Each structure stands twice: as structure tokens, then as C-alpha cells.
Amino acid sequence: VEAAYLRRLGCIACPEHGPRHMKAGISMRQLSELRRRVDRLNQQYQGKLTVLMGLESNLISLEGELDVPEAYREYFDILLMGFHLSARPTTLSECWMFQIANPWAEQRYSERYRQKATEAYLRAIEKNRFDILVHPGLHWPLEYQKIAEACQAYGVAMEISARPKHLIFNENQTRQMAETGVQFVIDSDGHKPEEIGRVQSAIDFAER
């Protein structure tokens, strides 16, 4: 937050990882305290910087389930959704699909896995309320056109990340997705203070 203020940003979103992320997931029991911390920061920086409490929820099943129950939605100013290899799936069979077979299939661009992954994303978009789809295609090959059409229909924006390894689709695919009318969000995807607000590479990509 201090880095955002020093860079004269008007607003910063601070999304934690969802609870099933095995490396960095936040417990639902921590939400009340986190909400209070964000509210205090907004008082501290009032008129200078707006701090949004967010969560990067995890896609955890082929049926499109997320690891954030709808009842907790009120805690967040902004909710993101993405797929992470470190997120714990709901069943053992999905563990095989999500964490073992699919990363291998990604390298071969298996059509079967592309279809399954796309269907899981489409179900997630249709069944859940969230604001931004983050790093689509990371670890899972996707049919981007179908994803973009669903995002446009349900009012979900797609991320263009300044973090190179999180920007999976290419310029031509981006142009095709833009034709659906879907909105894009450019962000730094910063994990360190020095990365906050560094979005020029994502802007350059979008302008091409």
C-alpha cells in the first residue's frame, strides 16, 4: 500500500489467495480482521489512495466450483478467479486432472484436456459472481474465444498481466477476444513492493 501511495496511484487492489491455495491461501477465519485492516488503511490514506480488499479465488472442480462460498462475497470489494496448480481440488480424480495429467497435456496441447479445461472455466463463469478472470490459460490450454464470449456475457473482465509468465495468450488471440466486446484489465500482478504499479509491458502488449 505504501508503494502504491509513493507511486501516486489512485487505487490499489490487494487480493489474497483463496483458502485452497496450499502455499499462500488465506483462512476464511481471517477475513474479518483483514477487512478491518483494509478499512483502517482507507482511513489513513483518505483522499489520497483507495485500498480495495480482494481475493484471488481458485477454480477447484470441473463443475466450476470456487473455493470461496457465496456467503463470503460481501467481505470483498473485488473478487478474482483463476486456476493454480497449488490449489487443492475437490476430488482425487480432479487432483489427477488438475495437478498431474493436465500440466503434461498442456505441453502437447491435447484437445481433450483443452475441452475439459474450457468447460470448467465456462461453468465457473456462469455459476459464480466475480469481477476478473486472471491469467487464463496458465497451466491449462483453453479455447480463448469461448472464454471471452462468456466473460462478455456475464460482465467479467479478463486480465492482461504485466508478469510475463502470466500472460499466456498472444496478440492475435487478444484481438480476436476483443471482437467479442469483452473488457480487459491491465495490472502489475505485483508480488513485491517494487513491482506495484509497473504495468508498462502490459500496456505495450495491449497497444500492439
Question: Which sequence ranges carry the predicted segments?
Answer:
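Phosphate-binding active sites in nucleotide-utilizing proteins
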Residues: 1-21, 27-30
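Non-catalytic positions within long, well-ordered alpha-helices that form the structural scaffold/packing
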Residues: 5, 72, 125-126, 178, ...
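Extended substrate/RNA-proximal surfaces in nucleic-acid metabolism proteins
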Residues: 22-153
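Histidine/acidic-residue-rich catalytic or RNA/ligand-binding cores of hydrolases
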Residues: 24-25, 142-151, 167-180, 193-207
